[in-house]
A protein has these predicted regions:
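Charged, solvent-exposed interaction patches on well-folded alpha/beta domains
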Residues: 1-166
Length: 166
């Protein structure tokens, strides 16, 4: 994933001064000639970080703020489902949650713990929205029950064609 930290001048997709993170949450500087040919074809999500108190990002060591977002990226990259869209960006507004923006413009709030349960809830909600011809604008996946969902009121979906059995 790309790291986004505008306060430190780090922006996603910057081949010269960009920073990448691996699946374990270890950051490293982007090396244009080495990394760009491999990642140019992939649409890597970006993870926004608040600037550390030291004023510098730590390379080569596991970063706690990246652990859950990178675990979620890994979980969703292995999920095969027609309902799960791709991750565009992840932001961390506070210490107990992070927000994910998906390619279908849905925004989901996750807790750092119980990601598998939250991904299951997201998949169920997206499937239900599709079956009822609605689009989810925002969903908070932190509660275990009664997950709050905000639907797009302006969204018009053409009903799905249902096969007729003869």
């Amino acid at each position: 994933a790309w790291i986004d930290c505008p306060e430190l001048g780090i922006h996603p997709g910057d081949a010269k001064y960009g920073v990448l993170a691996d699946k374990d949450g270890v950051m490293f500087p982007c090396m244009e000639t080495i990394h760009m040919p491999y990642i140019q074809e992939k649409k890597l999500p970006s993870v926004s970080l608040r600037p550390p108190s030291s004023g510098q990002l730590a390379y080569g060591v596991r970063t706690r703020d990246l652990e859950a977002p990178m675990q979620l990226i890994e979980l969703l990259s292995g999920a095969v489902s027609e309902f799960l869209p791709g991750i565009v960006s992840i932001s961390t507004p506070n210490d107990w949650s992070f927000c994910v923006r998906f390619s279908n413009d849905c925004q989901a709030t996750f807790s750092h713990y119980g990601l598998e349960r939250q991904v299951d809830k997201l998949e169920q909600a997206l499937e239900h929205a599709r079956q009822t011809h609605r689009k989810i604008n925002a969903i908070n996946l932190i509660p275990e029950h009664n997950v709050p969902v905000l639907f797009d009121g302006a969204y018009e979906d053409i009903p799905l064609a249902e096969p007729i059995e003869e």
